[in-house]
């Protein structure tokens, strides 16, 4: 896999999960279309405009649709996931090959639900995850993982992109030759092992 492509992909992943970037609800509609196209039009998303900074969402039924309000896109996605789990009793897997099973009729929300996040930063991934199957993923796999992270409120996905460039700079500044440094680097499958020099 081209390192430049991986860098751009992980940069997109980080930006997608940042909680303070507001480009509006269309991204949520697109996610619904990917996950459950038959019901995608049944969800309304609305960004809250108040000055409260805590991540939160509100769920309610409105004119036969499910209305989700949140202070940012990440909160809106977490609200959607709360509805899917607790009302539709369904699960969104991070595996792109697994479909999301939805009820024929979306359940109504009897009274508004208001939920605040318990913490500001929600971390996901570790060095080892980049060495399992990720080196072989296609765009659909990454897209599903990005959707999954948004649905689960992740605000800080680990990104190891560029670490070898930093290692190269540090080690050559310390006097190692180009050949010595490059002989240490490995393929993407084993990059996570090289980070801590122990098997995962």
Predicted regions and their residues:
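Bacterial Sec-dependent signal peptides at the C-terminal "C-region" and cleavage site
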Residues: 14-23
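Single conserved hydrophobic/aromatic residue that forms the stacking wall/gate
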Residues: 190-200
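Sec-dependent N-terminal signal peptides
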Residues: 5-14
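Exposed beta-strand-loop-beta-strand "reactive/processing" segments of non-cytosolic proteins
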Residues: 55-59
């Amino acid at each position: 896999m081209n390192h430049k492509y991986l860098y751009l992909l992980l940069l997109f992943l980080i930006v997608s999960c940042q909680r303070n970037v507001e480009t509006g609800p269309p991204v949520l509609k697109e996610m619904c279309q990917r996950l459950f196209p038959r019901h995608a039009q049944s969800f309304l998303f609305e960004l809250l405009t108040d000055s409260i900074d805590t991540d939160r969402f509100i769920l309610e039924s409105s004119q036969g649709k499910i209305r989700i309000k949140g202070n940012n896109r990440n909160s809106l996605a977490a609200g959607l996931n709360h509805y899917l789990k607790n009302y539709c009793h369904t699960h969104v897997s991070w595996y792109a090959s697994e479909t999301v099973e939805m009820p024929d009729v979306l359940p109504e929300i009897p009274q508004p639900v208001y939920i605040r996040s318990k913490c500001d930063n929600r971390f996901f991934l570790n060095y080892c995850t980049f060495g399992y199957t990720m080196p072989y993923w296609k765009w659909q796999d990454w897209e599903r993982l990005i959707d999954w992270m948004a649905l689960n409120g992740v605000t800080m996905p680990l990104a190891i992109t560029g670490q070898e460039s930093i290692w190269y700079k540090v080690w050559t500044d310390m006097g190692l030759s180009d050949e010595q440094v490059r002989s240490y680097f490995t393929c993407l499958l084993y990059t996570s092992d090289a980070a801590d020099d122990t098997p995962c």
